[in-house]
């Protein structure tokens, strides 16, 4: 079957590249069509921010937090990825680098807490309560991790 990967013998996958030819100009039109106005138009973006600020959100700080948590989390993951898949060693230097990146993540987490007017204790307590409901016996369960009850985010 085209596209199957042979994981034995380190052979290249048997892929017929013509099976999945895409008209990139049509794809670009599709992507543009399913993109919200605030994502592609500056004035709509500003109006969206103004509307959210008018609703009482601290959107500028939330946006800072969201972008920062994602970026710094990616840097943390990059170190782990290189250790697991690219031969980077587990050593004091890499451990310290992970701690530094984790500190950067926490800085942005605190930005989010400040934007939401909550404490880190509130976040942790809420997380513990959520997980107690998901795992009432106090132990991980694969089924419950994949099959959530209604309202379990």
Set out the residue ranges of the language-model regions.
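Flexible "arm" and connector segments at domain edges
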Residues: 2-153
